[in-house]
């Protein structure tokens, strides 16, 4: 839950940003308390994002093997570990493929029902599509009424608790109810941030310890482990450069394919649009172990195992959907009247795209590239199966060290990666926000 919570938050945020806050204010003017307006108005509107976040977490956790392998025991074996055991130890590719197909079938079945009820467009920050139109609501029937009854009940409970709190706790007359709500929101947000960030920052002090193994609290202060990372015999600098090179090329190819696809999906109406969108974002909803095993089969026939080209193509497959989703979210907020004005002044579509559209949304494009870069840089499953032992990326080297020899060198590498990735994320978020402000 700790590792996957950010993915859930980002998925819900994309939908919640499109909710009109005036609706809750209107409910307040009609006498509804904040609890009632949340459960009866805000939560139903944010349900596509909540469901999308839950499903993405479910699918991603199905493909998890790093955390169970490092922290779990024999009784905590996950299905991905079973697939890897059949391939690496038993060389039973047929049985591993059968398990992978069962896993893929389960995931596709779940997302089929999700698409029927809410629509896959919510994954790109859209609202409920045609899948949740009046026709679907009529099919839901009793289920919708039952759900509304639950939400109404939760709203009444929250309203009653709020009224009881007002009677028991005396408020400062100079402070409004919104001030207290804002304070509570900051407290909850602070707890979540501490939950997410605190375990990560435990790595930093450990990387400066004088001991030869991981201990807490760390003893002494030493830079020897950072010296080990940058020593001439260390594999980490070369692995870092290799990971950066692969991530750059993967991000480039993902942008080359993903940006035109995003424009087509947002601006064009054609038959089978939802099917094509589902196909393009399918790597997001498919556990990476299935993609890695499938690409291993394919690339082995094409003699691409153990080559940089094979690894770059594999990373492009998993990064392209994130580029499409990110660029689609930016294009949806773009004012097409700017393009139309350029057309009326005699500019062609290609010139308009190059001199008008791209400069305005370039922040979003750079952010999409950086997201693709981060995902590729941090990818382990593809590196395990597509490198063929010929070379190793930085995540693969860290994985081997975590399994074979855990020492403070790993903490030093993790600290450097934390600084590197944090810088990229902050820059990409800054560019995304600036792009949204320019579009708005």
Task: Annotate each PLM feature.
Residues 1, 208, 234-265:
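Transmembrane alpha-helix signature in integral membrane proteins
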Residues 2-20, 34-63, 188, 193-200, ...:
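Transmembrane alpha-helices
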Residues 8, 49-84, 203-212, 323, ...:
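Non-cytoplasmic
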Residues 10-24, 28, 39, 95-172, ...:
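C-terminal transmembrane helix and the adjacent membrane-cytosol boundary/short C-terminal tail
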Residues 68-120, 177-181, 223-235, 377, ...:
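Interhelical loop and adjacent transmembrane-helix boundary motif
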Residues 108, 172-202, 276:
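N-terminal signal-anchor/first transmembrane alpha helix
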């Amino acid at each position: 839950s700790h590792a996957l919570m950010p993915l859930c938050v980002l998925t819900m945020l994309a939908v919640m940003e499109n909710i009109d806050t005036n609706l809750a204010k209107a409910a307040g003017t009609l006498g509804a308390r904040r609890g009632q307006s949340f459960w009866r108005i805000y939560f139903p509107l944010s349900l596509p994002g909540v469901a999308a976040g839950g499903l993405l977490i479910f699918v991603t956790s199905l493909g998890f093997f790093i955390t169970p392998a490092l922290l779990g025991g024999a009784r905590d074996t996950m299905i991905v570990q079973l697939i890897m055991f059949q391939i690496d130890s038993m060389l039973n590719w047929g049985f591993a493929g059968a398990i992978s197909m069962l896993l893929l079938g389960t995931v596709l079945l779940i997302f089929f029902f999700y698409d029927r009820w809410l629509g896959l467009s919510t994954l790109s920050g859209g609202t409920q599509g045609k899948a949740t139109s009046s026709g679907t609501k009529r099919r839901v029937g009793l289920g919708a009424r039952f759900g509304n009854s639950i939400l109404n009940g939760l709203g009444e409970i929250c309203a009653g608790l709020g009224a009881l709190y007002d009677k028991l706790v005396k408020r400062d007359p100079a402070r409004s109810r919104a001030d207290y709500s804002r304070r509570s929101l900051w407290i909850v947000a602070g707890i979540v941030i501490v939950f997410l960030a605190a375990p990560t920052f435990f790595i930093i002090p450990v990387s400066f310890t004088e001991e030869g193994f991981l201990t807490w609290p760390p003893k002494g202060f030493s830079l020897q482990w950072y010296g080990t990372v940058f020593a001439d015999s260390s594999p980490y600098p070369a692995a870092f450069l290799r990971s950066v090179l692969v991530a750059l090329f993967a991000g480039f190819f993902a942008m080359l394919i993903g940006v035109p696809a995003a424009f087509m999906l947002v601006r064009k109406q054609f038959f089978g649009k939802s099917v094509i969108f589902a196909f393009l974002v399918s790597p997001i909803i498919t556990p990476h172990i299935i993609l890695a095993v499938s690409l291993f089969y394919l690339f082995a026939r094409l003699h691409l195992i153990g080559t940089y080209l094979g690894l770059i193509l594999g990373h492009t497959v998993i990064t392209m959907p994130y580029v499409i989703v990110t660029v689609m979210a930016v294009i949806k907020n773009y004012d097409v009247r700017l393009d139309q004005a350029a057309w009326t002044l005699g500019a062609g579509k290609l010139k308009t795209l190059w001199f008008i559209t791209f400069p305005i949304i370039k922040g979003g494009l750079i952010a999409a590239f950086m997201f693709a870069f981060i995902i590729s840089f941090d990818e382990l499953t593809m590196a395990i199966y597509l490198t063929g032992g010929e070379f190793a990326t930085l995540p693969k080297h860290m994985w081997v060290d975590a399994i074979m020899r855990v020492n403070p060198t790993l903490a030093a590498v993790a600290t450097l990666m934390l600084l590197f990735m944090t810088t990229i994320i902050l820059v990409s978020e800054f560019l995304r926000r600036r792009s949204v402000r320019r579009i708005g």
